[in-house]
C-alpha cells in the first residue's frame, strides 16, 4: 500500500508537488513549479510547516541527524537536502525526484514540514562558501508550502 502527500506552492513562484512512498522504501516527488528564473534552484524540505512569517518561519533544512549539508546522493547530508530543480527558458521546472532519506511515515516523517524553493543554485555543500555546509549557498526563499497527507 502506498502513502501519498501533496504540497501546494503559492505566490509568484507556484506549483503542486506530489509525494508517494510504498510501505518501506524510497519516496518519489513529482510535479511542476512555475514562475522561476531559468536555471537551477535549491529544493529542500525545511524543519517546520510554520509559514506565519512566510518561508522564513519554516526554519532550517530538516536535519534530525545533525549532519552537514550535502547532495541527495551523499551518505552525509541533511534529510531535507533534495538538491536542485531546473527551470527551463519559460521558468518552469518539472520535478521528478526519488529519494532514499525522506519518508512520509515514522519518527522522521516530512508530513507537516515545508518544501522551500530557493532563489539560487544549491552548491551541494561543495562550493567553499561560508554557508555551503549549512544551506548549500542557495540564496533566498522564493516559495514554500506545507506537506500534507493526500486523501487519494
UniProtKB/Swiss-Prot annotation:
Broad class of enzyme this protein falls into: oxidoreductase
Coiled coil, from the record: none
Disulfide bonds: 55-144
PROSITE patterns assigned: SOD_CU_ZN_1 (PS00087), SOD_CU_ZN_2 (PS00332)
Positions bound to Zn(2+): 61, 69, 78, 81
Gene Ontology terms, MF aspect: copper ion binding; superoxide dismutase activity
Stored Pfam families: Sod_Cu (PF00080)
Keyword hit for Iron-sulfur: no
Cofactor(s) needed: Cu cation; Zn(2+)
Cofactor note: Binds 1 copper ion per subunit.
InterPro entries reported in the protein's UniProt record: SOD-like_Cu/Zn_dom_sf, SOD_Cu/Zn_/chaperone, SOD_Cu/Zn_BS, SOD_Cu_Zn_dom
Keyword Disulfide bond in annotation: yes
GO CC terms of this entry: cytoplasm
Modified residues (N-acetylserine): 2
Assigned keywords, A-Z: Acetylation, Antioxidant, Copper, Cytoplasm, Disulfide bond, Metal-binding, Oxidoreductase, Zinc
Activity regulation, free text: Inhibited by KCN and diethyldithiocarbamate.
Subcellular localization: Cytoplasm
EC number: 1.15.1.1
Residues annotated to bind Cu cation: 44, 46, 61, 118
Quaternary structure and interacting proteins, as annotated: Monomer.
Similarity remark: Belongs to the Cu-Zn superoxide dismutase family.
Function recorded in the entry: Destroys radicals which are normally produced within the cells and which are toxic to biological systems. The plasma superoxide dismutase has phagocytosis-stimulating activity and may play an important role in the biological defenses of the organism.
Name of the molecule in the record: Superoxide dismutase [Cu-Zn]
Protein source organism: Halocynthia roretzi
Amino acid at each position: 500500500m502506498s502513502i501519498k502527500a501533496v504540497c501546494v506552492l503559492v505566490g509568484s513562484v507556484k506549483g503542486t508537488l506530489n509525494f508517494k512512498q510504498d510501505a518501506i522504501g524510497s519516496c518519489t516527488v513529482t510535479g511542476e513549479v512555475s514562475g522561476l528564473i531559468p536555471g537551477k534552484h535549491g529544493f529542500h524540505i525545511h524543519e517546520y510547516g510554520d509559514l506565519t512569517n512566510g518561508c522564513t518561519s519554516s526554519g532550517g533544512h530538516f536535519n534530525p541527524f545533525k549532519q552537514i549539508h550535502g547532495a541527495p546522493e551523499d551518505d552525509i547530508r541533511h534529510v531535507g537536502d533534495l538538491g536542485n530543480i531546473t527551470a527551463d527558458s519559460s521558468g518552469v521546472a518539472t520535478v521528478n525526484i526519488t529519494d532514499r532519506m525522506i519518508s512520509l511515515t515514522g519518527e522522521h516523517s516530512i508530513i507537516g514540514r515545508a518544501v522551500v524553493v530557493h532563489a539560487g543554485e544549491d552548491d551541494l555543500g561543495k562550493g567553499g562558501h561560508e554557508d555551503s555546509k549549512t544551506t548549500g549557498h542557495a540564496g533566498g526563499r522564493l516559495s514554500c508550502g506545507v506537506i500534507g497527507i493526500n486523501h487519494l
